[in-house]
């Protein structure tokens, strides 16, 4: 007998309100055929590879920390194209349009030879080697078994291009719940934190993206360069799912490492191996069989195992730098438009990680007159140097000042319209205002307590390597290495129209092949 039954499945209805659609910049930004080449000076930095060196008489930094494992974040300042004195005034209408820059190509130049740098700690928390032990090593009676250990970090090459700072992630100490009431010495809860990657932030060298300063109180579990730092890693998942995609137009990454040594930590184990799972009458737990009382294994060793990583071979065959990259389509909705006339370039490269060893005789004695070598007669110093050069291909673009476009930009970032001086200016209620000459003197009234403030830099509290390119632009692309590469790969040729150099497609003609007569 057939019986009708109501559908038991759930019915999903569309949202009552329409979902706002974010447009791509290609839908409202009009690109021109005018291109500029921008380049920086040779950017150099020198410092100590492990820590800041302070003046003994004050807290002033004498030698800054410059490590090959740090992030270098360049903030490139571009000129305002709306203030350009263009020879061809038909390029855009300032009453109906605004000009912006679009990044079409970039080359990050790196100087200095390839080299492997070592990191370490003179008091490294390493009790023994657990890779190939020949005898069972019990926990010694000594209260301090730290060793002087060094190793090479994980090999890392990476750069990220965007018009906003790169978003990073790291694990940090979290606040426990009030109802938990953990006892002293308990492992604290940890949480994932997102923050902008700034210049000088340490990258992951093989021990994870962690706040080591807050979560490793023994100050001996990692190397000196990160023991008092926070290692950050770019949050690619969040940047790829960003609505606008300003933090990352595109990126290139190459990581490489392998476990070279296997050690065990010293100290008391916080999480003991579970021994409560007792079998029926066998007195055996689920993880090991208890040893005899007269054996060395009776006092079970530490189970805090960890490897020391190695970046292995450094080769010029796998370099991301000193080569051009062209941007045709960005991963987000922002297809390379440099809002606020700025570009952020986040770089990590520890394939040029050589640390210079400099030895100095404190007595300033002539080397030829030193008879015998004594180690205490020389002072050893470490220095690390880095060399960069940035080149860009910028395309001039137009943004029409229509209601739809302005609404889209206002929803994205209203400060862009303020910078374009498109804010609503009310009519003055009184054309005549009072202006005092000696407003700061005691004879006149107090000045206004709330004077109008200029728009503050949203990144003023962040640390970046500022590079001014406002006077480093050129229309002569064929006079520069990156410009010639761009003209060749795009199949373009440079022409001059009304005093403005533009690019047009190169058309090649072939002669008619005649048939050979017999």
From Swiss-Prot:
Q: Which domain of life is it from?
A: Viruses
**Could you confirm whether the keyword Iron appears in this record?**
no
Q: What is its main location?
A: virion
Q: Which GO terms describe its biological process?
A: endocytosis involved in viral entry into host cell; virion attachment to host cell
**Residue spans of biased composition, Polar residues class:** 131-142
- GO molecular function list: structural molecule activity
Question: Does the record bear Electron transport in its keywords?
Answer: no
Question: Any one cellular component term from GO for this entry?
Answer: T=7 icosahedral viral capsid
Question: Which InterPro entries does the record cross-reference, listed alphabetically?
Answer: Capsid_L1_Papillomavir (IPR002210), Capsid_L1_sf_Papillomavir (IPR036973), dsDNA_vir_gr_I_capsid (IPR011222)
List keywords of the entry alphabetically: Capsid protein, Disulfide bond, Host nucleus, Host-virus interaction, Late protein, T=7 icosahedral capsid protein, Viral attachment to host cell, Viral penetration into host cytoplasm, Virion, Virus endocytosis by host, Virus entry into host cell
Coiled-coil region list: none
* Subcellular location per the Swiss-Prot or TrEMBL entry: Virion; Host nucleus
Q: Where is this region: Disordered?
A: 127-149
Subunit and interaction comment? Self-assembles into homopentamers. The capsid has an icosahedral symmetry and consists of 72 capsomers, with each capsomer being a pentamer of L1. Interacts with the minor capsid protein L2; this interaction is necessary for viral genome encapsidation. Interacts with protein E2; this interaction enhances E2-dependent replication and transcription activation.
Q: Which family does it belong to?
A: Belongs to the papillomaviridae L1 protein family.
**What does this protein's UniProt record list under function?**
Forms an icosahedral capsid with a T=7 symmetry and a 50 nm diameter. The capsid is composed of 72 pentamers linked to each other by disulfide bonds and associated with L2 proteins. Binds to heparan sulfate proteoglycans on cell surface of basal layer keratinocytes to provide initial virion attachment. This binding mediates a conformational change in the virus capsid that facilitates efficient infection. The virion enters the host cell via endocytosis. During virus trafficking, L1 protein dissociates from the viral DNA and the genomic DNA is released to the host nucleus.
This chain belongs to the protein called: Major capsid protein L1
Q: Which organism is this protein's natural source?
A: Human papillomavirus 21
């Amino acid at each position: 007998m057939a019986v009708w039954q109501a559908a038991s499945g759930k019915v999903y209805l569309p949202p009552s309100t329409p979902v706002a659609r974010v447009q791509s910049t290609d839908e409202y930004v009009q690109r021109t055929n005018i291109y500029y080449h921008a380049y920086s000076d040779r950017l150099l930095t020198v410092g100590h590879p492990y820590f800041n060196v302070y003046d003994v008489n004050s807290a002033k930094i004498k030698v800054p920390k410059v490590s090959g494992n740090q992030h270098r974040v360049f903030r490139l300042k571009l000129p305002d194209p709306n203030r350009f004195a263009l020879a061809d005034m038909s390029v855009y209408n300032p009453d109906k349009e605004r000009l912006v820059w679009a990044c079409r190509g970039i080359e990050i130049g790196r100087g200095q030879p390839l080299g492997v740098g070592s990191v370490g700690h003179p008091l490294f928390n390493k009790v023994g080697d657990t890779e190939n032990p020949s005898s069972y090593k019990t926990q010694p009676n000594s209260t301090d078994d730290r060793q002087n250990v060094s190793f090479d970090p994980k090999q890392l090459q990476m750069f990220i291009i965007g018009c906003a700072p790169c978003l990073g992630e790291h694990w940090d100490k979290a606040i426990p719940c009030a109802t938990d009431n953990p006892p002293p010495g308990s492992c604290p809860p940890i949480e994932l934190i997102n923050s902008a990657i700034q210049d000088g932030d340490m990258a992951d060298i093989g021990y994870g993206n962690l706040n080591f300063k807050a979560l490793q109180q023994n100050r001996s579990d990692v190397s000196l360069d990160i023991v008092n730092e926070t290692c950050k890693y770019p949050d690619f998942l969040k940047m790829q799912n960003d609505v606008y995609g300003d933090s990352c137009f595109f990126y290139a990454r190459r990581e490489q490492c392998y476990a070279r040594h296997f050690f065990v930590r010293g100290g008391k184990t916080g999480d003991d191996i579970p021994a409560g799972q007792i079998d029926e009458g066998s007195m055996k737990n689920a993880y090991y069989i208890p040893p005899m009382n007269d054996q060395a294994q009776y006092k079970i060793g530490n189970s805090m195992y960890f490897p020391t990583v190695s970046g292995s071979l450094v080769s010029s065959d796998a370099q991301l730098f000193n080569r051009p990259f062209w941007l045709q389509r960005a991963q987000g909705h922002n297809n390379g438009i440099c809002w606020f006339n700025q570009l952020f370039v986040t770089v990590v490269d520890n394939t040029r990680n050589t640390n210079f060893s400099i030895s100095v005789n404190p007595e300033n004695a002539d080397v030829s007159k030193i008879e015998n070598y004594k180690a205490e007669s020389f002072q050893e110093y470490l220095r690390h140097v880095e060399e960069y050069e940035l080149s860009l291909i910028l395309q001039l673009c137009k943004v029409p000042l229509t209601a739809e476009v302005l609404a889209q930009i206002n929803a994205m970032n209203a400060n862009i319209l303020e910078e374009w001086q498109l804010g609503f200016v009310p009519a003055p209620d009184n054309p005549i205002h009072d202006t005092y000459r000696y407003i700061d003197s005691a004879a006149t009234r107090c000045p206004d307590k709330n004077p109008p403030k200029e728009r503050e830099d949203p990144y003023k509290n962040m640390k970046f390597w500022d590079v001014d390119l406002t006077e480093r632009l050129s229309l002569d692309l064929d006079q520069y290495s990156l410009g010639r590469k761009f003209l060749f790969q795009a199949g373009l040729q440079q022409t001059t129209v009304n005093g403005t150099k533009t690019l047009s497609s190169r058309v090649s003609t072939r002669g008619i092949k005649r048939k050979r007569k017999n």
